[in-house]
A protein has these predicted regions:
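Active-site-proximal, glycine-rich beta->alpha crossover segments in alpha/beta enzymes
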Residues: 133-134
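Bacterial N-terminal signal peptides that target proteins for export
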Residues: 2-14
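N-terminal secretory/targeting leader peptides
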Residues: 9-12, 27-129, 145-356
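Short, low-complexity interaction segments enriched in Ser/Thr/Pro/Gly
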Residues: 1-2, 33
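Bacterial N-terminal signal peptides
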Residues: 12-24
Length: 356
């Protein structure tokens, strides 16, 4: 009986202490201030937030969680921040941007992106499956399309790739720029529309879910889009031709500003790189089996006979015709972009001479 009373008394004392500590009597237990993220990285992509919904849960959120909350990533997507595609070049050059998703890591028809390559960025490398395919002897014409590919040229690669594609003209075989004259092409941006004009073609805004019908009915002759998108969308069945044209070849990769990375503590640098490395196969699987389609590489192999590469001399001519456009775009975004483009052109010239 006495033992029960003693236990009851002890229980009451403990309960009373808990009440006091939880503030039920108007007292509050001393608490440490909420830990705020000590470091912040600003991320941007030239696409609306809904375009790549996998990005935050499969990558950005994983990095933040792995850092134990010490790192915050401010996610600004196209349409939600004030920077148009080429203007992001200026933002990056001023060091106001730490991370970005870059579409087309090689020579780009939207030439201001090329300026990013001359800045201190750590860029992603190629997906193993794609490069194995391009190295296949039977795919020499496809491999030649990557005649100026980033892995060879910039020597700054080796991290990650979260998707991959080759850009070109779906529905059209282009042996000469004359083959594009009069063609009605689906174009995803006004930059590409302007580029098509210089070769006598016209660009049209056709929603992705209407492209099959538009191609089949002749409303459009082709589409400026990625090979992966073209095939996985079933568009080969509507217009079974594709010409890879390196006006926008390459990869969709995560880009991290080297300077931003260097400012972080060594352990956080390691956490970012390790998390990206761990998530790379997860995201790649997501692309191949979900975001794009199953049997991606099988599809490319199956349609091998319809895939051709634009000859480098034709590409060079195309680029030469587009140079005035690129100069205009550089002027639109101000002197910083123009200066970077000048440095890039000089780098490009020296690199080309070193390969002769």
């Amino acid at each position: 009986m006495k033992r029960n009373k003693r236990l009851f008394f002890i229980t009451e004392v403990i309960a009373l202490l808990l009440i006091v500590l939880t503030g039920s009597f108007g007292f509050t237990a001393p608490t440490s201030p909420a830990q705020k993220p000590a470091y912040k990285l600003i991320f941007a992509e030239a696409a609306p937030r809904g375009v790549n919904p996998w990005l935050a849960p499969l990558l950005l959120d994983k990095i933040v969680k792995a850092s134990g909350g010490r790192l915050q990533i401010q996610d600004m997507r196209g349409g939600e921040h004030p920077y148009a595609l080429p203007e992001m070049l200026v933002v990056c050059s001023k060091g106001s941007l730490d991370m970005a998703i870059i579409h087309g890591l090689s020579q780009s028809g939207t030439e201001p992106w090329l300026g990013l390559m001359d800045l201190p960025f750590l860029l992603s490398g190629g997906a193993q499956e794609l490069w194995a395919l391009l190295n296949d002897p039977g795919f020499k014409d496809v491999r030649d399309a990557a005649w100026d590919n980033p892995l060879n040229k910039w020597n700054q690669f080796g991290l990650l790739t979260f998707g991959y594609t080759e850009y070109g003209f779906g529905g059209v075989l282009v042996n000469d720029l004359k083959d594009l004259k009069g063609k009605k092409m689906r174009a995803s941006s006004h930059w590409i529309v302007e580029m098509l004009k210089v070769v006598g073609a016209s660009g049209h805004n056709v929603p992705m879910n209407e492209m099959f019908t538009a191609l089949k009915s002749g409303v459009i002759d082709g589409a400026c889009t990625g090979l992966v998108t073209y095939q996985s969308g079933g568009l080969m069945e509507a217009a079974p031709y594709y010409t890879i044209a390196p006006y926008e070849p390459g990869l969709i990769g995560l880009t991290i500003n080297k300077n931003s990375l260097a400012k972080l503590p060594k352990d956080l640098q390691g956490i970012i790189l390790k998390t990206c490395a761990l998530q790379e196969p997860v995201v790649r699987e997501h692309f191949q089996t979900g975001y794009l389609s199953k049997g991606l590489m099988d599809s490319i192999l199956k349609n091998y006979g319809t895939v051709r590469a634009m000859h480098p001399s034709v590409v060079a001519n195309f680029r030469k015709l587009c140079e005035p456009l690129w100069d205009q775009w550089a002027q639109q975004v101000g002197p910083p972009a123009g200066e970077v483009l000048k440095r890039v052109k000089e780098f490009d010239r020296k690199w080309s001479e070193s390969k002769k």
